[in-house]
Amino acid sequence: MKVVNLKQAILQAWKERWSDYQWAINIKKNCPKGATWDYLNLAEALLEQAMIGPSPNPLILSYLKYAISSQMVSYSSVLTAISKFDDFSRELCVKSLLEIMDMFSNRLSCHGKAEECIGLCRAMLCTVVWLLQGCAWYCERLRDPNDFSALESSLRACLERMANLLHSTKNRALVHIARLEEQASWTNVEQAVLKLTENLSAVTNPTLKESLEECVSLVKSIPQMLCLQCDPPVHTTFPSVHAFIMLEGTMNLTGETQPLVEQLMMIKRMQRIPAPLFVLEIWKACFTGLIESPEGNEELKWTAFTFLKIPQVLLRLKKYPQGEKTQDFTEDVNVAFEYLLNLTPLLDKADQRCNCDCLSLLLQECNKLGLLSEANTATLTAKRSEDREHAPRLKTAENANIQPNPGLILRAEPTVTNILKTVDADHSKSPEGLLGVLGHMLSGKSLDLLLAAAAATGKLKSFARKFIKLNEFPKHISGEGSKSASVRALLFDISFLMLCHVVQTYGSEVILSDPSPSSETPFFETWLQTCMPEEGKTLNPDHPCFRPESGKVESLVALLNSSSEMKLVQMKWHEICLSTPAAILEVLNAWENGVLSVEAVQKITDNIKGKVCSMAICAVAWLVAHVRMLGLDEREKPQTMIRQLMTPMSGENTLQFYHERVVIMSSILEHMCADVFQQTGLSLRPAVEGQEPIPYRNLLPARLPIRQALQSQFRKVLEKGWVDSHAFHLFENLLHMGGVFWFTNNLVKELLKETRKEWASRVVELLYSIFCLDTQQITLTLLGHILPRLLTDPAHWHSLADPPGRALAKLSVWCALSSYSSHHKGQASARQRKRHREDIEDYTSLFPLDDTQPSKLMRLLSSNEDENSMLSSPGDRSISSSLSASQLHTVNMRDPLNRVLANLFLLISSQLGSKTAGPHTQFVQSFVEECVDCSEQGSRSSILQFMPFTMISELVKLQSLAKPKTVLSITDLSLPLGRRMAAKAIAAL
């Protein structure tokens, strides 16, 4: 039956005055088998015939009402038919259409196929346009005083239906899907809104006008449905921000600024921290770090981090794109400083430690960078000066002897740039001038200040490259006298010492460059990789690098054993350094076999350290590797040689800057030997009261199982409420010693012990910051091993009950989002890049996913089958049930993190479909809720893209997730299939 025949049937029924049920019986008899009334446009045909005259045909309208009541026609087809009527001057017709809408507008739903649900979305969008156009038409006519009351009544009728439609979040969600499905149709909405807004001035009734404005506002809010955030948290302290800043200041001064900014923004977004409190937490952590850092290098590092790096971080935060910006970032910084001024004891303690007004210096730095206005800077400075009048002071004599580190660091920063320029210049003709600059750098704590300033401003790598180049310079010898030979020796020695110091203070990754096939690897890089002892690095004393040509070794031994002074002319220092370990081995063997006396060995070690300290460092580097291989009773003589090499020479016959060079050499050797001397309970130098020999070394308590050490330290941190530098170093040691799985698993067990909600929340924040020690690997372990075991083993389900279960869900989502975001942007921190671990799993073989073939995928997406058969039950591991947005976005499934996320969501999906409820399903619910709360809406970086589409229908069975906004949030609305699945789920609510 074609539509024309349908019209004839309607006319026949009207002529013969059939009742509504007679009409229904007769029309069904003549309808072709299998055809649907929507396909035949029954609703449109009935309305078309009913609305021919100036008033509606009541009999034909009764047929339509019967069809709606008996579900012969769908709501979407009726709404579409209504929206095609455009003659608003026929008020009776419009009134009848609105009454038809009233029959079902309060129960708009669809339980059919996804395509039918999308049809309902489109129909609702058309209805919104129609109602807006109707309101605009009546508003425009209100300017005419004739028939004012009738027009206002019609306007009110249209408005009531529109308000009824739009006040439902479900309806707005369906319109939102239609907007994404058909962008062109949304243009009609915008035009209708514009026309209505233009004519609002004609409405004189204030209540009516206010209602119209409210409806317009609701329509405009539809595109931003997912941007509306919940209220910010009520608490004012955020341990995760505090601890993350402590971690970065303690362990990652050399890290790039942008990854730090991204990570901070991720924390701010996930916890919805107000900007002033966020900035305040950063400053609180900086001041805490300044106060508690050990004297020496660590104190300088914290000073550089606080006064140089953090202002730059804030500058980038100011420029960071933020959607819902409510006020200027400079005002946020100002408010944060006002809050900070209330923490007088913290500021006083920092001022005492640094011997200066720390806050005033920070305010000046922020003002220079445009983070604070002049007026605010002056007000805050005056307030702090007033508070300092009552602060406890150090004694005047003590004050006079202490130069404030913040001032020194701020002055060192421009000096770094000048030194880089100086070193870059051509010194081949007169290297003496450069030697003077280097000598000045060695005096006092100048070198440490310059290195800290360079590290905080991202110039340390450039600094190191320049000194590696300088270390290569003495290789080139051409007819030289004794003066130029000594200058060449000093240039080599000072650059070598500086580079060793940089490695021990900031890590070898600062020095090592990316391998280039064309250029030769510099000497120092080669020596560093093969010969230099570092924490956690074991060297083989029999490695070929310690065994150069025997002829060179013999001549060096003879030179060291002679009574005459070592000649510097034509000396190839790089070769000497490489030959020194073998020469030391010869000397040690001779001493152990009674060929050499103690006095003879002392003379040889004096010769080694007498001119260039680099030789002593190379000798001790090998001795440390050698001692590690010996039993405790065999170590006496090698350790005696180490002590001899560490003791400075007292004679006058030494090269320039000897005292300064020896100070650095002693520090380098002390770091090298700390581990081997600790094993025998010996020390290299007498301990100074109140000062650790080397900060953060040997933190693990003796004779205590590492699990107990971990539990004990974590309990201390939990009671304290924040993680200090000492704790971070201890946690890192435990992470290295126990491995990623052991570390993560035991800390998760600590979390699952917490049965109090507020304590469980605190544990989450602290664990998140501790896991930043190696976010990527810990996240892989947490999501790939620990959660699957807890979810699949019924014996563990009880531990997933709230509150610890919800806390674990929050922690898992935070880790997953942070890892995915930094991984997605390729921003692993230097601290994480440098780790080499043997316990890292091969996640590709561990989780063999069916890497969906594109041809299969396209066949699946173009299928016209019912979704119930296309997307089978979650328990089925077929290709269709595992289909997720990530596969349609062609995300690389061979990447470990992507693979683990995909498998976790498959597991969660199967748990939901297993029909067994319990704490594990409660955990799944919490996990998805956290994903929705924390994810950036509309972002491709959301981990929800790994969720199978079939999981949506299972999630809406959980009461707390059966919300339109939640469904919109968990589906990828940029994909047609995502929109269909969302429409199907929402339309059924």
UniProtKB/Swiss-Prot annotation:
KW Nucleotide-binding (keyword) present: no
Q: Where in the cell is it found?
A: Nucleus
Please report, in chain numbering, the residue ranges of the motif LXXLL motif 1.
343-347
Its GO biological process annotations read: enteric nervous system development; interstitial cell of Cajal differentiation; positive regulation of transcription initiation by RNA polymerase II; retinal cone cell development; thymus development
Motif LXXLL motif 3 is found at 447-451
Record motif LXXLL motif 2, residues: 359-363
Keywords (alphabetical) are: Activator, Developmental protein, Differentiation, Neurogenesis, Nucleus, Repeat, Transcription, Transcription regulation
Where is the motif named LXXLL motif 5 mapped on this chain?
787-791
Q: How does it assemble?
A: Component of the Mediator complex.
Q: What is this protein called?
A: Mediator of RNA polymerase II transcription subunit 24
What species is this protein from? Danio rerio
